[in-house]
Amino acid sequence: MSQDMVTVLTKRILESVQYYENFSIPIGVSNRHIHVSREDLDILYGEGYALTHKSELGQPGQFAANETVTLQGPKGTFKHVRILGPVRKQSQVEISKTDSFRLGIKAPITLSGHLQGTPGITLIGPKGTVELSCGVIIAARHIH
C-alpha cells in the first residue's frame, strides 16, 4: 500500500471518528408516574378538570403535568406522583421494581398499555379517590 493511500485512509477514519464523537442520542429514565383516564381525572381533580403543562416530554404531544396524586398500596404510599398528559383511554401507573416492594404490589414488567392481569392500586387526589382494579406495571425497557 502506498503512502498516499495510507494518508487518505487515515484521514477518512479520523473524520468518521470525529463525526461519531459529536453524535449523541438523548436518553431518559422515567421516574414513577401515572397516565389517567378522563373519568378518573374527573374523580381525582373534579368534573371537567384540565391538566396544566409543567414541561414537554420527548414524545410529541405528551407532557408532564403540574398535577400529582398519591399512590396507596397494601404496604406503603408514594406522595406527589406526577401525572403525564394528555388523558388516556385507561389509567395506568408505572413504577420501578423497588417501588413495587415498597408499595407491596407484584407489578409485572411489561410494555405500556399491556394492562390485562396487572394489579390495581388506590389513587388519591385533592377531590377524590379512585380504586384501580388493574393498571400497575413496571415498564419494560423501550425506545420512543
Report the location of each language-model feature:
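Short beta-strand-centered segments at strand-helix junctions
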Residues: P26-P74, K79-P126, V130-H144
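Short, low-complexity, charged amphipathic interaction modules
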Residues: M1-E21
